[in-house]
Amino acid sequence: MKLRKAWLLVLLLALTQLLAAASAGDAHEDTSDTENATEEEEEEDDDDLEVKEENGVWVLNDGNFDNFVADKDTVLLEFYAPWCGHCKQFAPEYEKIASTLKDNDPPIAVAKIDATSASMLASKFDVSGYPTIKILKKGQAVDYDGSRTQEEIVAKVREVSQPDWTPPPEVTLSLTKDNFDDVVNNADIILVEFYAPWCGHCKKLAPEYEKAAKELSKRSPPIPLAKVDATEQTDLAKRFDVSGYPTLKIFRKGRPFDYNGPREKYGIVDYMIEQSGPPSKEILTLKQVQEFLKDGDDVVIIGLFQGDGDPAYLQYQDAANNLREDYKFHHTFSPEIAKFLKVSLGKLVLTHPEKFQSKYEPRFHVMDVQGSTEASAIKDYVVKHALPLVGHRKTSNDAKRYSKRPLVVVYYSVDFSFDYRAATQFWRNKVLEVAKDFPEYTFAIADEEDYATEVKDLGLSESGEDVNAAILDESGKKFAMEPEEFDSDTLREFVTAFKKGKLKPVIKSQPVPKNNKGPVKVVVGKTFDAIVMDPKKDVLIEFYAPWCGHCKQLEPIYTSLGKKYKGQKDLVIAKMDATANDITNDQYKVEGFPTIYFAPSGDKKNPIKFEGGNRDLEHLSKFIDEHATKRSRTKEEL
């Protein structure tokens, strides 16, 4: 018995030792795994810090950039994207440049940066396109905007690398209260930017603005560009109603006009060249007027004056400058033309081509214009009478002529050529009979093929009718007339029903999701009002397209954003496929993808568009926090 107990004790001791050894082994393995993981992380960090060379070009990133450039006087940088076709095409040339500059005395480093992964550097150097080339001189970036040829780039780099090289003075003029009036009043035309030093949009505009200034300074005569620090020159900012940054204004001999052009070099240059020309063209012969009326396709605007020194003519020119992007203005000093138009000199005449005239509206709209007439009054008169009672809506004039709502559109085969004009006018005349009784609405005819997508979205492409009609209202909603034989009576009933609020809108929509509990709410056409326009909640809405590369890149970031704010009951992070669903409020304009708006609770008609800044978690979070009307803590803050 004692012997058996002894054996049991021996076995227990042996088992205990085995378990201890196994545990130690596991611990050793765990430690090894941890050490291996740490070593792998350190290797990855080392990879980021190590500067590699590919075909003579140094490869830089956010991690190794500062150390690499710290001791170098001059470095040539190329910011590229792996998918960029121009970058791929430029690569062999860039390698030749690297080889040439490597043999320079002293050698000049040539480097490239993948701007899609080195986001900090891309942001620091304001990279907005690919490839972007910059020359780093003693740590300061010098923009290169010449051709992408070895000869020109090498020459510029060598020029900048010289010990006595200094940046050229800015071409953009700096204005203060002391010199503003002298400069602006004496310029036939000048573009002035009111900026704030801390403004991100201003910083982004600055290099493009300077490049445009350089380009326009070469013209004969030159077109000057200037800038005003509105935070310092507060009196000037107040004088010209500057309420945001940057604000750009065109001045003609001291008279201010809004700048509505692009904000990059070539866009600014083209816009200012166009603006520098006369806003109104002189008509010299009666034949020109007759051709406008016979063959024209838009409103005919003619000012008739005593001469180019007539004060009324100068006021007309001011009005024309305000509207020159939307209308073609003409003027004449010819008594013969005045007689043909049955007016005296000192008048503004608006008329429409013969095909758009009708018995329900005057042939000519005439306004007295004197030296005391305000340019704004002329402008208002032109806008008021620019459309005929029933005009021709086309894709080329839609944005400028038919943006006003409600808009009644009648779709059929519209063709004003000789063979088909009678048929086109037959249906247009039926529309005219209704339009005359609803002056508060805009009426137009439109070719059904030009607007095939719109007709399809209205559910009318398979109507079986030759003529269809719809109404587009102020909120972005669309109403389709039930398919039936078209005549004036059916159109009148349709418009009357709309006026009384008895019509239901047509909404293009994907199916409503059955399960919509994810971190990012899916919005479709039928749920836009319920989710985005919910007056009790703040909503961040992304409008995307399934084929859009930038949208695909944003998707994981946007999902992370949704998870971050998931616990906030008064905030919704949402997305909508804008190619498959109607946006039922026209305040949410989408001109590209992705487009992001913040719709604040209680103020849904004034959404705030996300502009500038990177579409990353940090910047999107900051955007939300800045505009949130009801703030609660996120998961990260708890």
From Swiss-Prot:
Subcellular location: Endoplasmic reticulum lumen; Melanosome
All residue ranges annotated as the Thioredoxin domain in the record: 21-162, 162-294, 498-629
UniProt-listed SUPFAM superfamilies: Thioredoxin-like
Locus of motif Prevents secretion from ER: 635-638
Residues the record lists as N6-acetyllysine modifications: K359
InterPro entries: PDI_thioredoxin-like_dom (IPR005788), PDIA4_PDI_b (IPR041866), Prot_disulphide_isomerase (IPR005792), Protein_diS-isomerase_A4 (IPR017068), Thioredoxin-like_sf (IPR036249), Thioredoxin_CS (IPR017937), Thioredoxin_domain (IPR013766)
Residues carrying sugar: N36
A molecular function (GO) term: protein disulfide isomerase activity
Swiss-Prot/TrEMBL GO biological process terms: blood coagulation, fibrin clot formation; chaperone-mediated protein folding; platelet aggregation
A GO term from the CC aspect: endoplasmic reticulum chaperone complex
Compositional bias per record (Acidic residues), positions renumbered to this chain: 32-50
This protein's UniProt keywords: Acetylation, Disulfide bond, Endoplasmic reticulum, Glycoprotein, Isomerase, Redox-active center, Repeat, Signal
Result of changing C87A: Substrate-trapping mutant
Residue interval(s) of motif CXXC: 84-87, 548-551
NCBIfam families cross-referenced by the UniProt entry: ER_PDI_fam (TIGR01130), pdi_dom (TIGR01126)
Family the entry assigns: Belongs to the protein disulfide isomerase family.
Alphabetical list of PANTHER family matching this protein: PROTEIN DISULFIDE ISOMERASE, PROTEIN DISULFIDE-ISOMERASE A4
Quaternary organization: Part of a large chaperone multiprotein complex comprising DNAJB11, HSP90B1, HSPA5, HYOU, PDIA2, PDIA4, PDIA6, PPIB, SDF2L1, UGGT1 and very small amounts of ERP29, but not, or at very low levels, CALR nor CANX. Component of a complex containing at least CRELD2, MANF, MATN3 and PDIA4.
Protein name: Protein disulfide-isomerase A4
Organism: Mus musculus (Mouse)
Lineage start: Eukaryota, Metazoa, Chordata, Craniata, Vertebrata
